[in-house]
Design a protein with these regions (language model features):
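Bacterial N-terminal signal peptides
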Residues: 4-12
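Eukaryotic scaffold repeat domains enriched in small/polar residues
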Residues: 19-333
Length: 333
């Protein structure tokens, strides 16, 4: 093992977490080399297709399992004024700015359109099906029976759930208290969603001092918290807490660097993987850390993860602007 610097808070560069690394993972290959800047999310559908969101361009792109481009759902910000007019005249529904998306078992696409203050729903062929008005959506995850879970920039609860008709049916998840300043505390509770095939929902707190993923059932009952509290992460957590205290007395908008940068859940087992920049942590379904890895491209550059797909035999990791890479899944031995 070797000690490697993994993540520094921009505002507190003097303090840096150091993690014990079990192995270095080098990507087998780069996927979709035309995609890099603006990359938001990568998903694998049950149909084997790979879905990629990069905003504002090229938008949400669907690839076959062999890598052939099948479909693109465009965004306003990636088009000229003339192209936007042509789209409007033709009846094409454009996404304003996609922050995240998910795909359900039927291939329908749910896009968190932050600029449009909505979740836009498209069929697998790109036909627009429905708009759900949601103020500043940040992350989405599909649930059984056509439901979709949504996180927002400032809702009173962490998660809102909408049914197949676009009606809000429940909210859940009280924000944890990290600051007495209300807007700052809500910002620090911003999170990313994922779901598994077992009916669980996962909420990754992106700005918590200690990287944390909370498990819920689909009805909002909280299960376990998976928290990275190893000694090597103590310095980073202390730096984040100092920055919280520093910004608490200010009146301007919160400004923090994400601590937990990507969440991946193996759909069949519910095992959680979380990324902190170029460092990848694997936890078993009981929340025990199994291993820690560093991520590299075939050329030796670090892969700073913004999105993560976990499969039985491989990992797909993507970052803005470095692009999307396929890794052989390690055995954790």
């Amino acid at each position: 093992m070797r000690l490697v610097a993994v993540l520094c808070l921009a505002a507190s560069a003097a303090v840096c977490a150091r993690a014990q690394v079990d192995a270095e993972l080098t990507a087998k290959r780069r996927l979709f080399p035309e995609i890099g800047p603006g990359l938001k999310t990568v998903k694998r559908g049950v149909d084997g297709k790979i879905y990629v969101l990069a905003s504002p361009t090229p938008g949400l792109v669907v690839f076959s399992s062999e890598g052939k481009r099948l479909l693109a759902i465009r965004e306003m910000g990636g088009l000229t004024a003339e192209a936007r007019k042509e789209a409007a005249d033709s009846g094409e529904v454009l996404v304003g700015f996609g922050e995240d998306f998910d795909v359900d078992s039927e291939g329908n696409l749910y896009v968190a359109d932050r600029a449009g203050n909505a979740v836009q729903i498209f069929s697998g062929t790109g036909k627009h099906l429905r708009t759900i008005p949601v103020n500043a959506p940040l992350s989405v995850a599909t649930l059984p029976e056509g439901e979709v879970a949504v996180t927002t920039l400032g809702g009173p609860e962490l998660v809102s759930v909408y049914d197949k008709n676009g009606r809000e049916v429940r909210e859940f998840g009280d924000p944890d208290t990290l600051s007495d300043r209300q807007d700052l505390n809500r910002f620090l509770n911003i999170g990313e969603l994922a779901s598994d095939a077992l009916g669980h929902l996962y909420y990754a707190f992106e700005y918590f001092p200690e990287p944390t993923v909370r498990q819920y059932d689909r009805f909002g009952y909280a299960g376990q918290d998976i928290v990275y509290r190893e000694l090597d992460a103590l310095g980073e957590a202390q730096a984040v807490r100092r920055e919280i205290a520093k910004q608490e007395s200010r009146k301007d908008a919160p400004r923090f660097k994400r601590v937990l940068t990507a969440l991946g859940v193996e759909r069949g087992t519910g095992e959680v993987w979380m990324a902190m920049g170029d460092t990848l942590l694997h936890f078993d379904k009981e929340g025990n850390r199994r291993a820690t890895y560093l991520l590299y491209t075939p050329e030796g550059a670090r892969v700073m993860a913004d999105t993560l797909v976990v499969e039985k035999d491989k990992l797909i990791v993507g970052g803005d602007p470095i692009g999307i890479y396929e890794f052989e899944r390690p055995s954790d031995k």
